[in-house]
Amino acid sequence: MRRAAGLSLLGGSGALLALSLFYGGGTSQDRLFWIGAAASLLAGLGVAGSELGATGRIRLDGQGRAALALGLAFLAWSGAGLGWSIAPDRTWAFLNRGLVYLAFFALGLLVAAASPRARTATALGLATLLLGVVGWALLGKVFPGLFPDGGRVARLRSPVGYWNALAFLCALAFPLGLWVVTDRRRPGPVRAAGSLLLYLAAVALVLTFSRGGLVVAAVAVLLWLWATEERLESLGALVAATVPAAAVAGWATTRAGLVDDLQPSPVRAADGRWLALVLVLGAVVALALSYAADRSIERLDPASRRAWGPRLGGALLAVALAGAVAYAAASGGPERWLDEFRGSGEVSQGSARLAELSSNNRWSWWQEAWTIFLRHPGQGTGAGTFEIARRPLRQSDVVTTEPHNLALQALAEMGMVGLSLGLAASLAALAACRRALTCLHGEERRAGLALATVVPLYLLHALFDIDWDLVATSAPAFFVAGVLLGSGQRQARSPARPLRAMAALALGCALTYSLAAP
């Protein structure tokens, strides 16, 4: 029974993550209701089952409990803002969104308690979902009818609905793909799928034209190389996938039907057919290079592998630094970069944006958030109210719901208390994730290392975008955090606690009602 309950939890959680990624509807509150209600009810049932002994009991160590307590305090403070919010309905919506993410966190804890191989199953499942996401995104370019509104704005964003969010998911695919590819114990087809994930994620990442996404992807790779012992294997797989991906993406940027706005359907369809051919050819090259690199590395003895990893990594780093120096010399240096970053002009939506340094209005929004904080330093204006609070301050007609920086958003909307609680919860979660990895061994530890990149990457991306407002980015991050914080805890039978089970069910129903309430 415990095994069946654990599989049901894992399957239900996977289905909810798939819904979040493919049908999250961007920042839509309507989609959040259905996904959040299902997550809340499943979490309530799961906790009730755990308290009755149907699954493993949730166990959190001291750092995990501290992270959970601080997160709950952050949500409680956002809810307390209903008493002074300038837009209580928006504050209520912010609180509801946070409670939905808490439900995903609880599901992660339940999955971790239900299965001793929860980390491996979660990493494989998330990698599979991300392969589906990037595959569907590129399929929308091959068949334009699958890409809603792709004729008006060409930047790749389906199925998530927002290009920067899709770029973030592409970045998450790199550590997971490298984890799959570098595990020689896995069957050949599974490792080949990992290579395809790396290749397709790299192509899709470029076609989002997201500069922040590229930065987060680079950090993701660096985190994985720092954490893993298979550095040479990872570098080989990375080069094998990204070289043909760069060629395919570079070719795609020359086709009007793929990257230019307002193109007629025949042009988009024709270029889509060519893209299909080029993608397949690139995939063949990527798989061939990956196989060749793997065979070459396999011939080396372990000592040589350990020696060549830093050498190859150093060479790639030197090339990157040389490119950065050349770009700095050609673009005028840091002072000009700062001036361009703080400029108020909007960035183009095409491939040329990748070479631009403008913050695309973010600098102005950050200044507005700071000004709002100075006027309301203690309590803020109420969670979710930035769009209204900035109206007397804004100097352009550009509308934004958030300042594209979660820390400044918390500062403006919830004051110093909200920011302090949010920062403390984030740091506690990072520390708890790191502590949890020490409890894992073997394959579970390798999977945990890949998953452990998700939380810091989410926090990094949230410093210059609206990740909190997107269930497609937040649900996986909170679920993974739960899986990690529940890692390594002993699976022990304990007496059933029916009162706690009833309380868990009541909380799940209460959250569902809160989502439905106006």
Residue ranges with predicted function:
Residues 173, 405-406:
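Transmembrane beta-barrel architecture of outer-membrane proteins
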Residues 1-25, 33-49, 72-82, 88, ...:
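Alpha-helical transmembrane segments of multi-pass inner-membrane proteins
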Residues 99, 136-147, 323-375, 379:
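Aromatic-rich transmembrane-lumenal/periplasmic boundary elements in polytopic membrane proteins
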Residues 59-68, 306-307, 498:
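Interfacial transmembrane-helix boundary/kink motif in multi-pass membrane proteins
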Residues 491-518:
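N-terminal alpha-helical interaction modules that lie
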Residues 162, 351-400, 407-410, 414-421:
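TM-adjacent membrane-interface loops and short helices in multi-pass inner/ER membrane proteins
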Residues 48-56:
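C-terminal ends of transmembrane helices
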